[in-house]
Design a protein with these regions (language model features):
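Hydrophobic transmembrane alpha-helices that form the pore/transport pathway of multi-pass ion
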Residues: 5-139
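Long, contiguous bundles of hydrophobic transmembrane helices that form the permeation core
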Residues: 115-176
Length: 176
């Protein structure tokens, strides 16, 4: 029982471990943990070391916006808290509302990448590390990439827009 029984296709393994699993770990722990956990798993499945590192680091490029339970948004914007709290007296928005809006805009910017990045990365992986060294071998898995993008982005959008950046870091990645 293991990843080999789910799929022997390296492209599928890269998506499941490098994209979905690493994004979940980013939401739970953040701070570089996804690459530290996912890359050795890809190595154990027979990926070249450089390919495993590149896959994990590039796929982890946009889940970091929500980071470990929303830390980059909630803590990163904390210097604005006094300004926003002062604005509440004038009828402005609260710090929590501001963080939620930032999370919503973040989600909107990431949704296209949830579909583009997997296709590009599989093409890159097969071009430079595949047995046939062709882009088309990776691009031929575009249907699986679209499915993975939907599994990632639909819950991502719903959770970020309804629950906020803290929960947006985790819940949608479980669906992936």
């Amino acid at each position: 029982y293991g990843m080999q029984n789910i799929s022997r296709d390296k492209r599928v393994q890269a998506i499941i471990i490098g994209y979905m699993f690493a994004a979940f770990i980013e939401g739970a722990a953040g701070f570089g943990t996804p690459a530290a956990l996912a890359a050795p798993l890809l190595l154990a499945l027979g990926f070249p070391a450089m390919a495993a590192a590149i896959i994990c680091l590039v796929f982890n490029s946009f889940p970091v916006s929500f980071g470990a339970v929303g830390t980059p948004i909630v803590m990163g914007l904390s210097p604005l808290k006094p300004i926003l709290d002062a604005g509440v007296a004038d009828g402005g928005m609260t710090y929590a509302a501001f963080c939620k809006i930032v999370g919503e805009y973040c989600t909107m910017m990431h949704i296209p990448m949830a579909f583009i990045l997997p296709v590009f990365m599989l093409g890159f992986m097969t071009r430079f590390y595949g047995p046939n060294r062709t882009w088309s071998e990776g691009f031929s898995a575009w249907k699986y990439c679209i499915f993975a993008g939907v599994c990632f982005s639909v819950p991502y959008f719903i959770v970020a827009w309804t629950l906020g950046p803290e929960l947006g870091a985790l819940h949608h990645r479980v669906a992936g």
